[in-house]
From Swiss-Prot:
Family (UniProt): Belongs to the EF-1-beta/EF-1-delta family.
UniProtKB keywords: Elongation factor, Protein biosynthesis
Protein name: Elongation factor 1-beta
InterPro entries in the record: eEF-1beta-like_sf, EF1B_bsu/dsu_GNE, Transl_elong_EF1B/ribsomal_bS6, Transl_elong_EF1B_B_arc
Physiological role: Promotes the exchange of GDP for GTP in EF-1-alpha/GDP, thus allowing the regeneration of EF-1-alpha/GTP that could then be used to form the ternary complex EF-1-alpha/GTP/AAtRNA.
Statement: the UniProt record of this protein carries the keyword Membrane: no
CDD domains, sorted: EF1B
Gene this protein is translated from: ef1b
Example of a GO MF term: translation elongation factor activity
Length: 88
């Protein structure tokens, strides 16, 4: 089976959320679930930041939903946007 690269935009639930702490918890929660290809903080504007996350998963039904469910359990994550899904 092929692999899929999935990009997510993780928005904090509040402007007071420390995105570096959120990033650490994302790495911890996804350990053993999928391979993290890239994770970085990006600016929205006015001092607000979000986490851009790229993961590699198997190309099978339900994988993106499974990752979203794990990400929703991360403290401080308010919104999860799946930005791109592509075969690699």
């Amino acid at each position: 089976m092929a692999d899929v690269l999935v990009s997510f935009k993780l928005l904090p639930s509040d402007s007071d959320v420390d995105t570096s702490v959120m990033e650490s918890e994302v790495k911890e929660k996804l350990n053993g679930v999928c391979k993290i290809n890239n994770i970085e903080e990006k600016d929205i504007g006015f001092g607000l930041k979000y986490i851009h996350l790229e993961v590699i998963v198997e190309d099978k039904e339900g994988e993106v939903d499974r990752i979203e469910k794990v990400l929703s359990m991360v403290k401080g994550v308010g919104e999860i946007n799946t930005e791109n899904v592509s075969l690699i």
